[in-house]
Amino acid sequence: SAAHSSAVRKALEEKGLISREHGVNRCIQINGMEKNTDVPVLGRVAAGYPILAVENIECYVPVPDSLKRGRELFALRVQGESMINAGIFPDDILIVHRTPVAENGEIVVALVGDEATVKRFYKENGHFRLQPENDNFEPIIVDEVALLGKVISLVRYFD
C-alpha cells in the first residue's frame, strides 16, 4: 500500500540509507554508493598452458574506486583450468594491478617469451617457478620471466 511504502521510505531516510530531493516526486538517491572506474578487459590469459599475449580491448568492467586506489589496472578473461584450486575458473575476469614486481606466493600474470599465463609466483635458486593451482598441471620453471601484474580481484558472472 502507499502508506506502507511511505513508512518504509521514511525509515530508510531516517537511517541515512537514502535521500530524497524535496519537491521532486520519485527522486530517491541511495547514499553511500561507491563510485566505479571502468577497467578494460584486454583479452584472454591462459590458466593452463601459456597462450600468445595480444592486447585487444574486448569490453570494460566496473571496479570500485577503493580497489583502484590510484593504481593502473587492467583485466583479462581466464582460459583454462590450471588455477581452479585458487578459485579461478574459465571465463572469470581477473583484475590485475600492472606492476613488474611480486612477492613469493602471489598470483601473477606472467609473460614467458611472448606467451602470457596466470600462476602463483616464486623466485627460488636462481630461477622462477610459476606454480599452477591444479594437480593436473606441472609448474613452469624459467630463468627469465616478465611480470605483467598481480591479480588483485576477479569478476565472475553467472549465466
Language-model features: where?
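Short, positionally conserved secondary-structure boundary motifs
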Residues: A3-F89, A116, K123, H127, ...
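C-terminal regulatory/effector modules of DNA-binding transcriptional regulators
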Residues: I88-D159
